[in-house]
Amino acid sequence: MGIKDLAISYVVFSTIHFFLFALALTTIGLYGTDLHNANKQGKYSDSKWVYAVVVGSISAVTCVLYFIPFVLRVAGFVVAIWDFILFVLWIALFGVFGKMYINEDAEGDGGVKRMKNAVWVDLASALLWLIATLAALGYWWKHRDNRSKFTGRAHV
C-alpha cells in the first residue's frame, strides 16, 4: 500500500490533524512554561493555564488517534461532534487569554510577548478545529448509508 492508494480525503484529514497536532504541542509548550516556573517557585498553578494545557493535551491525543486510518471512517458522525466540542474548548481558551493579553502592552516583557503570541495560536487552533468539524460533517453526509426507511433495501 503506497501513498497513491490512500484516499484524498484521508490525506486531507491527516494534513489538517498534523497541523492541529503541531498547534496543540505549541500550546502545551507556551502555557506549560508558566506552569513549570510557578511550580519551581512553589507558587500555585493558575487554573487558566492548567485549562490551556489540558485542552492542548486533549487535542494532541485526539490528533494521534485520528492518524490511525480507520478511526475517521468508522467513527462517522461522532468525529464531527467531538471536533465541534474541541472547537468550543479552543474558542473558550482564546476568549479567556484574548481578554487578558490582546490589548496588553508587552513593554519588553518576554512573558507577555509569549502570551500574546499564544493567544493567536489558540485562535488558529480554534479555526482549524472548526474547519475539521465542517470537513467531518461533509464527509459523513456524503458517505452515510441512506437506505429507504420502509424496506431498508433501496438506496435513496
Sequence positions of predicted segments:
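Juxtamembrane loop segments immediately following a transmembrane helix
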Residues: 93-115
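Individual transmembrane alpha-helices with interfacial aromatic-anchor signatures
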Residues: 109-127
